[in-house]
Amino acid sequence: STPLYSSAASDVYKRQPYQYSITPSSTYSVDPWIGCYSLIDNCNAILDNLETLPESSERNRIEGESLALRTYAYHYLIRMYAKPVNKYPDNPGVFVRLTSSTTDIPRSTVKDCYVQMVNDIEKACTLLTGTSSSSKCYITEQAAHGIAARIYLDLGDYTNGTSHANKALSEITLMSKADYKNKFCENNTETIWYFT
């Protein structure tokens, strides 16, 4: 037997997707929820403590990155755990927590989740204006616009979606065919932002 097969065979959670046996209680179902809310909690803790920093471009960058990451996490959650906004705007969405408080809150409607995401990502785009990074693991202006484009496309707002997509792609240089096979996992010119 091969090590890969033995490893997968020994772990029931690794086998579940291949046996079509994922259940609501399996880790494949809850890991995204836990991971996204952990990210949201971290972003909220940063946003709650921004006043301890002096007004500066660095503070704007930190606030913009936190808002964009929080928006990204809510967008991931809403697409995974709620119904589409265009057909079911009044259905339950996810819990929209905007502070690091642990007080129980009710689920917001899908529409309210999108309203909050739009508000946060638009503010993030403004705060991150002119930012760039040689590392693709930081949220920049282009990355925030990319997140905004996806949200507006979900809403069916193609005018704003196209506008944000164009801004996200404005500084992207396409790789040559030869570069593609050698730079798939590197900080290549076609990558706007990556999140792991």
Identify what each model region corresponds to.
Residues A8, Q16, D157, T162-T196:
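Hydrophobic-face positions in mid-chain alpha helices that act as interaction patches
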Residues S1-A9, Y13:
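Single conserved hydrophobic/aromatic residue that forms the stacking wall/gate
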Residues A73, A149-I151:
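Residue-level signature for tetratricopeptide repeat
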Residues K14-Y81, S108-T109, C125-T129:
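Conserved, well-structured interaction surfaces
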